[in-house]
């Protein structure tokens, strides 16, 4: 957590008032993120931003509907549709597939990155990732 706090401070990102989302909170966020991404990539990103801010900077408990609803609505998404997505099998299936892909790449957890045959873990690898993305873009244009 100290490393995350240091990076947040360096980048001017609020961080530190948190409620650990492990358990039901993670399940709720995965289900809503899966649903939001099916609506559009923009909706998925809007929910992710709202949820991350809520979890890591505002001490929102995403295992509780009152906090989850606030984060969904702040992302301009309809709560009733998001709530209906909770417990839907699609999110669990996608999470399992992602975990299998991570394992196959010899990775675990976040942040994990893969571009072609380049695989890396950790925010300290972001400069390498940026370089690989630039080279990949040049090779495909």
Residues covered by each model-derived region:
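Structural alpha/beta surface segment adjacent to cysteine/selenocysteine redox centers
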Residues: 1-55
